[in-house]
């Protein structure tokens, strides 16, 4: 859905205008129909995630707080930042959070973009919530290295606003990009970023063929464990902070570090 919506957003001005309106409605919970559609998508997404977690033997008992959880804190956080003279309106009519020695975070888009909030807005609300309400002393963001500047900005605002003190440890745990055999960003057969479930399925197909070639009988459970275990180990054996090639041929070698 996101891919189709992104394409329509980039190529259809009417769709783009509608998207700005719907986004603001979601953030303010001001349209029951819009919220109902989002709720349906959200539930289906969570169900899909849980299926992947189950395949990876990851607990489903997770405390999930997505962006929507923090919408109700936006006005409060805006007031806190305004009181500290950290918010201003730029030449384009956007509300921005001014940051020491770096570019600002856009807090609210301009009127021609629906006055909607950005993920920077909800990240600020999440940081405030985690540090002042949950009283978290350590906060880790496991996100790819391309977001390094964003988290530098985020943590600077947290410190300037007084949410992050010397007692807090906030860190961006950056990881590299997954590459294909050709050294380019890993993509599926249709040229898009692959889903983890697709990678697992491909691994299972590979192991199934490998056992068949060796005339080895194996249960579906064993095949699944070998495939998923190999994927996990291969990923964890690489340096977290650097890019690496994802190659089933190397991953399934019976010799070497596999």
Q: How should these model regions be labeled?
A:
Residues 1-258:
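NTP-dependent nucleotidyl-transfer catalytic core
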